[in-house]
Amino acid sequence: MLAQLPPALQSLHLPLRLKLWDGNQFDLGPSPQVTILVKEPQLIGQLTHPSMEQLGTAFVEGKLELEGDIGEAIRVCDELSEALFTDEDEQPPERRSHDKRTDAEAISYHYDVSNAFYQLWLDQDMAYSCAYFREPDNTLDQAQQDKFDHLCRKLRLNAGDYLLDVGCGWGGLARFAAREYDAKVFGITLSKEQLKLGRQRVKAEGLTDKVDLQILDYRDLPQDGRFDKVVSVGMFEHVGHANLALYCQKLFGAVREGGLVMNHGITAKHVDGRPVGRGAGEFIDRYVFPHGELPHLSMISASICEAGLEVVDVESLRLHYAKTLHHWSENLENQLHKAAALVPEKTLRIWRLYLAGCAYAFEKGWINLHQILAVKPYADGHHDLPWTREDMYR
């Protein structure tokens, strides 16, 4: 039976079962843990030279089904791709143009899916960014609260500080900073769905005198240095390589002298920012984050410094994000019946692959998560930061 498959597939030894449209099935190794159901004959040819993008696209379009644990399916599919995919198939990075209209459309595409859909698998505060696990067995809710606190501690946030939250999402960090640190917060987003629910939660907690959430593009931020601290969490991935300098200049102009800026976001493995993961990056660009671009740590750090800010602290949270994504993926998999009632089948397929696939990508080191803390020095070059980092952990 195995002889009916193309030679490239016959020679593989993977814990994978191929089940064909005609009922035939083939085990590519002992004790298969994952089954790929190929529903169309022409897909067999693609499987002899597959990329993660091709496999993902076939699943999203319903031409291929995955049976078994979704995380294990991602791993086995990557092993299949690794065995048959060549370096020549990799494409050079494509630089994207970004303007207010296209960025707003991209944000709406990703974040305006359904508040109820996000609530199924996010934590209670709906923090859609990397959590911070002080202990590996902490719950997602606890880890997200600890992330908020970790950011506020790094920013040395004090009572009465005016904090700018760029890409505030549903306002979880803004409300935490106001509630726990007595800060005044101005949060901006481009998502109308996020803004609506975020404002409802601000009102429900009685924080309307401290938290102001608005629709505003970062390019339109006031440049009079009115903010004591600036935080940007999971937002700069949407900025694009071409606009990194402008983005950092806007943060510089928004914060006062002596103030602090925190940039928390996903970074690329390669210095030139090219996609990794044998087509995984292309899948995300096509279906999940249109126009998204991940810069390397060196690229965003250089842009921060060129804008006039001084980088004073950098921390990698790569494995924290892998664990966060595992929580999200598991939560979604446990709520598939509810999710199917909230979003179209194609959307649900995209998100199942995206969450499990990103968890795998962070584990493999294809992408990273860095928190970069910077200060805007006074005119004479000094600043007020402590001589050590010890205060952040007291």
UniProtKB/Swiss-Prot annotation:
The active site is at C358. Keywords: Lipid biosynthesis, Lipid metabolism, Methyltransferase, S-adenosyl-L-methionine, Transferase. CDD domains: AdoMet_MTases (cd02440). Coiled coil: none annotated. S-adenosyl-L-methionine binds at residues 128-129, 163-171, 189-194. The keyword Transferase applies. One of its GO terms (biological process) is methylation. Pfam families: CMAS (PF02353), DUF7884 (PF25371). It is an enzyme of class 2 (transferase). GO terms for molecular function: methyltransferase activity. Its EC number is 2.1.1.-. InterPro entries: CFA/CMAS, CfaB-like, CMAS, DUF7884, SAM-dependent_MTases_sf. Belongs to the CFA/CMAS family. This is Probable fatty acid methyltransferase.
